[in-house]
From Swiss-Prot:
InterPro entries: UPF0178
Family: Belongs to the UPF0178 family.
Organism lineage: Bacteria, Pseudomonadati, Pseudomonadota, Alphaproteobacteria, Hyphomicrobiales
PANTHER family, per database record: UPF0178 PROTEIN YAII
Xref: Pfam families: DUF188
Superkingdom to which the source organism belongs: Bacteria
UniProt protein name: UPF0178 protein RPA2191
Length: 158
């Protein structure tokens, strides 16, 4: 079992791996907070909390970033939110299982900004590739690994 201080935050609007988060969180007895701009349906479970952060442009992102702390995990595809959470000392994982780290977040943010600019000029059309079963599997593995890594760090003598 992992220290109850670890909380999993989910940037829940359009997150394709909510069910996977529930399963892993239940296995490790970790609380989950799903944050969305509006109402979302979540299972009735004592470890699962739903937050409707409001309809502002970045309301859900701001809500998460203001509360996340070292040892917490955020699941998000939003690169600026991931950057804010990593800077706060949290672990950030994309729904496809890709971890956002201190070493990678700067380049990831720069590529995201470049792609946004290229799309706005019409140089690139379309979006990301479709979410696959392999992405789901990679995510499950990444989330489980992150939880175990945090638990080891907390258990290590200081």
């Amino acid at each position: 079992m992992t220290d109850a201080l670890t909380r999993i935050y989910v940037d829940a609007d359009a997150c394709p791996v909510k069910d996977e988060v529930y399963k892993v969180a239940e296995r490790h007895h970790l609380p989950v907070t799903l944050v969305a701009g509006g109402f979302i349906r979540v299972p009735q479970h004592p470890l699962i909390e739903r937050v409707a952060a409001g309809s502002g442009m970045d309301a859900a992102d701001d809500w998460i970033a203001e509360r996340i702390k070292p040892g917490d995990i955020v699941v998000t595809a939003d690169i600026p939110l991931a950057s804010r959470c990593v800077k706060a000392g949290a672990t950030a994982i994309a729904p496809n299982g890709k971890p956002f780290t201190e070493e990678s977040i700067g380049m990831t943010l720069a590529v995201r900004n470049l792609m946004t600019d290229l799309r706005s000029t019409g140089e690139i059309t379309g979006g990301p590739r479709a979410f696959s079963p392999r992405d789901r599997s990679t995510f499950l593995s990444a989330l489980d690994s992150a939880i175990r890594r945090i638990a080891r760090r907390r258990a290590a003598p200081t």
